[in-house]
Swiss-Prot record:
It comes from the Bacteria. It holds the Pfam family GCV_H. The gene is gcvH. One of its GO terms (biological process) is glycine decarboxylation via glycine cleavage system. GO terms for cellular component: cytosol; glycine cleavage complex. The glycine cleavage system catalyzes the degradation of glycine. The H protein shuttles the methylamine group of glycine from the P protein to the T protein. This is Glycine cleavage system H protein. Its cofactor is (R)-lipoate. Residues 24-106 form the Lipoyl-binding domain. HAMAP family: GcvH (MF_00272). The modification N6-lipoyllysine is found at K65.
């Protein structure tokens, strides 16, 4: 069974979100997603300053098995990206909920975050 931290929010397309103390939201892919992908070899990230809307294609993850799009879970502005992934994308495999985060965003509406799946709800989607 995949690791599904209870303190995070999720969407059915296997992204996780964490609300930070400063009101930004960190986004990455779940342990289940990285397991399905296999060894990650490349990640294309959004640009800082990008304005994104729900369901926009915002990143691409390439692995030895497949390429997969990552979609915006909520609307907002990208305020930081994980530049470490450019040189070391396999961090996603070893630490998907920690050092393997993709980007941080300032949400347009925090209620959109609150409405996402809980860990239990996400687990039921698997």
């Amino acid at each position: 069974m995949s690791n599904i931290p209870a303190e995070l929010k999720y969407i059915a397309s296997h992204e996780w979100l964490r609300l930070e103390d400063d009101g930004t939201i960190t986004v990455g892919i779940t342990d289940h997603a990285q397991d399905l992908l296999g060894d990650v070899v490349f990640v294309e990230l959004p640009d800082v300053g990008d304005i994104i809307a729900v369901d926009d294609e915002i990143s691409v993850v390439e692995s030895v098995k497949a390429a997969s799009d990552v979609y915006a879970p909520i609307s907002g502005e990208v305020v930081a990206i994980n530049e470490a992934l450019e040189d070391d994308p396999e961090i996603i495999n070893s630490d998907p909920y920690g050092e393997g985060w993709f980007f941080r965003m300032k949400p347009d509406n925090i209620a959109d975050y609150e409405a996402l799946l809980t860990a239990d709800e996400y687990e039921n989607e698997l």
